[in-house]
Amino acid sequence: MSSILIALGLTLFAGMATGIGSAIAFFAKKQNYRFLSVATGFSAGVMLYVAFVEILAKGATALARAYGEIPGAWINAAAFFGGILLIGVIDNLIPSAENPHEVPSETQMADFRDACTLSDTGAADCDDAGRKAKLLRMGLFTALAIGIHNFPEGLATFLAALSDPALGVAIALAIALHNIPEGISVSVPIFYATGNKTKAFAWSLVSGMAEPVGALLGYLGLLFFFGNPAGGMPPQIMGILFAGVAGIMVYISVDELLPTSRAYGRGHDSILGMVAGMAVMAASLLMMK
């Protein structure tokens, strides 16, 4: 039971990072978002390294044990691309305006500020009611879209932590970092539509709570089909899940994190953050052996 609580706790930590993004949007200097470039690049490096070096390898080992080396390798590859296909379908079902992979740039956030002026108390004031409603709709639909995306991410963190708590910590940290700009994409339009920082912060936090909900539903599913997940699952199921999770993480890194990092950074901020993330993850995995 303790391993299950740790796994659920890590997904809760990762999900709450959307609230950190919301706070940054309100209190950080609006003209300097380079820290987001490095942070999201770092997160991409961690997730790519873990996906290819650790999680995909775990899937291959489990499937080879269940089906033999050659059939297991084919099933591992199929499950990997199945994970990419799954998150890709989810991604493309969501309109780009509300898609969390389309994080608002500095220019877009400047447009929000131009659309709604700030009073001396820091509250937003929109003269155009239609524009205000559009901003609110954008923020709320973005929160919903992030919630949908966070379900498989929560399951990925949960499964990794259940198998290896140290690996789960690394993945939770990477997902938490990539949830920060998603929190910004929810809170900024809601704040400039309502003038209420508390409401904007609350919605960004709620969107991240889909992460532990996804983990909890995954746990209940495993409990229903396999009894006690902490006691171990059949290797063929664990292998397919790990390979699929690796595919999901690679898609998120390439489609979301790296483009976001490039959009916010200058020069080589993005690649430096990514390499640093890979190096830290490599050192962590080596020290844990």
Curated annotation (Swiss-Prot):
The chain crosses the membrane at residues 4-24, 35-55, 70-90, 139-161, 206-226, 232-252, 268-288. It is a multi-pass membrane protein. The keyword Iron applies. It is found in: Cell inner membrane. GO terms for molecular function: metal ion binding; zinc ion transmembrane transporter activity. InterPro entries: ZIP (IPR003689), Zn_transptr_ZupT (IPR023498). Keywords: Cell inner membrane, Cell membrane, Ion transport, Iron, Membrane, Metal-binding, Transmembrane, Transmembrane helix, Transport, Zinc, Zinc transport. It comes from the Bacteria. Zn(2+) binds at E153, H178, E182. It catalyses: Zn(2+)(in) = Zn(2+)(out). One of its GO terms (cellular component) is plasma membrane. The keyword rRNA processing does not apply. Fe(2+) binds at N150, E153, N179, E182, E211. It holds the Pfam family Zip. Belongs to the ZIP transporter (TC 2.A.5) family. ZupT subfamily. Mediates zinc uptake. May also transport other divalent cations. HAMAP family: ZupT. PANTHER family: ZINC TRANSPORTER ZUPT (PTHR11040:SF205), ZINC/IRON TRANSPORTER (PTHR11040). This is Zinc transporter ZupT. The lineage of its organism: Bacteria, Pseudomonadati, Thermodesulfobacteriota, Desulfobacteria, Desulfobacterales. The gene is zupT.
